[in-house]
Swiss-Prot record:
Gene Ontology MF, one: metal ion binding
Protein name: Type III pantothenate kinase
Gene it is expressed from: coaX
Native organism taxonomy: Bacteria, Pseudomonadati, Pseudomonadota, Alphaproteobacteria, Rhodobacterales
Keyword annotations of the record: ATP-binding, Coenzyme A biosynthesis, Cytoplasm, Kinase, Metal-binding, Nucleotide-binding, Potassium, Transferase
Annotated K(+) binding sites: D129
Source species of the chain: Cereibacter sphaeroides (strain ATCC 17025 / ATH 2.4.3) (Rhodobacter sphaeroides)
Length: 257
């Protein structure tokens, strides 16, 4: 079975793929100090609790936190006797190479989302990922990543507002019933929610103008469903887009062996 690992700035997601479907998906806070042994104990406990008899023989990793990759490699080598495929490393091939400025490093999560998005929806595509940062990835007609946009993430914006303005509380993002808030919490929630609706609409509109094409828009990330309530922002919300991309990239590299 394949162990797919998506390490983001906030959380790290582990999924077990049996060749046809994901048997389980688990999430843990990203911590560069966490050892391979700790990962193994955590994973083994979850596998036991869910009664999944998974014999992991292969692994693929995407990580936006370089310091975490070493211990994830050790986890795979020591406990599963496999060498993980790491997206963004020279040994990892992509179906179509990104077309960006020479010397530019593209986040592996963005490359993975591009591969999955193209596989599921074809080219001329915008992938919006609501993560620690809110990213917009543009996929050309042939499946190549050709650039995009990086904006502060929703929760990051809320935290920054709370940290910079002592009188403002930390609040959770939600869809407010009205744009005009009648208390401080409602005002903040309205500003963030409607502000990000406007951000998505504006950036998508500008990308379409520059591309001279009716780009399809898909969304992923934990907060994507929140911004898909009653609006025509996205053609589709894909909950496990990154994991699907990791499986596709692993399969592609296996075929090249």
């Amino acid at each position: 079975m394949l162990l797919a690992i998506d390490c983001g700035n906030t959380n790290t997601v582990f999924s077990i793929w049996d060749g046809t479907q994901f048997l389980a998906t688990w999430r843990i806070a990203t911590d560069h100090k966490r050892t391979a042994d700790e990962y193994h104990v955590w994973l083994s406990t979850l596998l036991s609790l869910t009664r999944i008899e998974a014999r992991i023989t292969e692994a693929v990793i995407s990580s936006t936190v370089p310091r975490v990759v070493f211990n994830l490699r050790v986890l795979c080598n020591r406990y599963y006797d496999c060498r993980p495929l790491v997206v963004g490393k020279p040994e990892c091939r992509l179906p179509v190479a990104p077309r960006v400025d020479q010397g530019t490093t593209v986040g592996p999560d963005r490359l993975v989302n591009t591969v999955a998005g193209y596989h599921l929806h074809g080219g001329n595509l915008i992938v919006v990922d609501f993560g620690t940062a809110t990213t917009f990835d543009v996929v050309d007609a042939d499946g190549a990543y050709i650039g995009g946009v990086i904006a502060p993430g929703v929760n990051l914006s809320l935290e920054a507002l709370h940290m910079a303005a002592a009188a403002l509380p930390h609040v959770d993002v939600t869809k407010p019933p009205h744009a005009i808030g009648t208390n401080t919490v409602a005002c903040i929630q309205s500003g963030v929610y409607w502000g990000y609706i406007g951000l998505v609409e504006g950036i998508v509109r500008q990308i379409r103008l520059e591309r001279h094409a009716p780009m399809k828009v898909i969304a992923t990330g934990g907060l994507a469903p929140l911004f898909d309530q009653g609006f025509d922002l996205f053609d589709k919300v894909e909950d496990d887009l990154t994991m699907q991309g990791l499986v596709l990239i692993h399969q592609y590299n296996k075929e090249l062996e």
